[in-house]
């Protein structure tokens, strides 16, 4: 019968902690967005590692189905939340990125995807900042710049900016 010592012996490194991570957003090559990459990394308050799904194909055989793996559907959206500081650095950069893809005023923008897409990184860290695992979200760009909720009832909180992002795997 397993006991607590067996469990502790099998929980390598004490387990990966949800609050030990780093997000790095590299600006796209074709749009000047004015993002301080190092500062933006410090302002991240939450992120996710999206799920991975395989499709399933039902193959009928004499009144029953057997199931085999199918194609991988498009990946889920990757979402990251930032503290919004008083110079709105991250928000301004994301607005410039969006406007570079499709300008509000004249409905133009960069055409080549490599000019507005970039690689984004999430690193799971150990408690001493050793990188345990790195996830790379390739050809990413912001789908939405989420609303920033404002309220006079919130006396002791910061505003946050959430950024849902499309990517390739």
What is each of the regions a protein language model found here?
Residues 1-16, 64-135:
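Extracellular/virion structural assembly segments
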Residues 1-52:
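Polar/acidic, low-complexity leader/linker segments enriched in S/T/G and N/D
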Residues 25-35, 122-130, 165:
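Short acidic, glycine-rich loop/turn motifs
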Residues 51-69:
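A glycine-rich, hydrophobic loop/mini-helix early in the fold
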Residues 138-150:
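Conserved short secondary-structure elements within globular domains
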Residues 149-157:
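Short proline/glycine-enriched turn/loop segments at secondary-structure junctions
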Residues 159-163:
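Conserved small/polar residues in nucleotide/adenosyl-binding loops
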